[in-house]
Structure formats: structure tokens, C-alpha cells
Amino acid sequence: MERISLLSLSLMLISSFSITAGLPAMKAYFSQFGYSAGQVELLVSLPAFAVVVMLFLNSLIERWMSERQMIVAGLLLFSTSGLVPLVVQDYPLIFLSRLLFGLGTGMINAKAISIISERYSGNDKTRMLGYRGSAEVVGSAILTFMVGQLLPLGWPAIFAVYGGGYLILLLYILFVPYPKEKKQASLKEKKKGSARLHSPQWRFSLMLAVIA
């Protein structure tokens, strides 16, 4: 279960674009209040920019928060802010929630790769990193399918898919204990390399920015 829990961290990393199917309905709704189509589309791409910002801030946050604390905080921020449009259909509040959603995603993304590199080596590490990449694609496909099923209930309902973040949080807390024997080593490594972003993180952030 530990491996499944670790891989589940990547299931929702590119989920900000999963709600695209709901854009027509969202545009129709917010046009009643004077919001343009471009402003509504921004709600989909905004998290991508927040992810990039968080990747730069992570080196500072790591000085006060452990890896486990960052992942838990990221999942809570991701899930809670992701569900806001489900209960509140106010553009400014949704705009803020999408921004926080991206920041939470950035906190998780920063650790989804490194946590595997720290816990596994050799073929296991290579295999797990490959599975992690697949988890992103599978997660995106599942969420997009779920959005399509929820859309007939109204566009606010599609944001319910982000409630899955709480399940991932539960799996992480229950099945991924912090490896005490690696604690000191990881802290030293963090001091040496906290200011640098891993190349996969750079590629991920740049990909989101280009798509947005």
C-alpha cells in the first residue's frame, strides 16, 4: 500500500485542466454578471501559473516545514480550495480558490518525484518513476471522465472531483510513514539542494505554462 499511496500523489497533478468540459456552461453563467469569456477561461489556466510560483517558493518553505508537512498541507489546500466552486459560485472567490488550488498542487508536485527518489534506488526507483508518470496520465483521464458524468448536474458539480484529494491524503497518512533512518540524510540533502529545482519539475511547470 505504501507504493500505491506514493503513486497516488501524482494522480491529480495535472487536474486543473480536467474541468475544461464545463467551460461553456461557466461562460453562460458568468456572462450574466458581466464577466467575459476570457475571464472565465482564466479560471482553468490560473492554477498552472500558481504551480510555477510555488516551485520557486518551495526552497523557502522547506526551511520551516518537513516533507511530510508540505505534502499534507498541499493536499489539504488542493482539496479544500478545489471544492470551493461546488458551494460558492462567486467569481472573485472562485478566482482566489483556483489560485490556492495551484499553490497546493505546486507543494505536492515538488515532493511527488523527490519522495520516490529518496525511498527507492536502482531498478525499483526507475520503475516507480515510470509508474508515477503513468499515474499522471491515468489520473487526468479518470478525472476528465468523471467531469463528463457530473456535468449534467450543473457546472458547479464538476468541481466535486477534487474531493478525491482527501482520499489521497488519507492513504498518505496511513501508509507512508516518514523513514526515520533517512531523516538526517534527507535533511542534509535538502540543505545542499533546496535552492535547485529538479529537471522534471522544471519540465512540468513549463509544460503547464505553455498549455495555459
Where are these regions (language model features)?
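Juxtamembrane helix-start elements in MFS-like secondary transporters
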Residues: 35-44, 129
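Extracytoplasmic
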Residues: 7-31, 37, 58
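Conserved MFS/SLC helix-loop-helix module at the cytosolic interface between two early adjacent transmembrane helices
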Residues: 53-91
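Residue-level signature of mid-helix packing/kink "hotspots" within the transmembrane helices
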Residues: 17, 47-56, 140-141
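Juxtamembrane intracellular "pre-TM" segments in multi-pass secondary transporters
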Residues: 177-205
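Helix-loop-helix hairpin linking two adjacent transmembrane segments in secondary transporters
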Residues: 131-177
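Interfacial helix-cap and linker-helix signal at transmembrane-aqueous boundaries
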Residues: 26-27, 31, 61-62, 146-153
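Cytoplasmic helix-loop-helix junction between adjacent transmembrane helices
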Residues: 91, 97-135
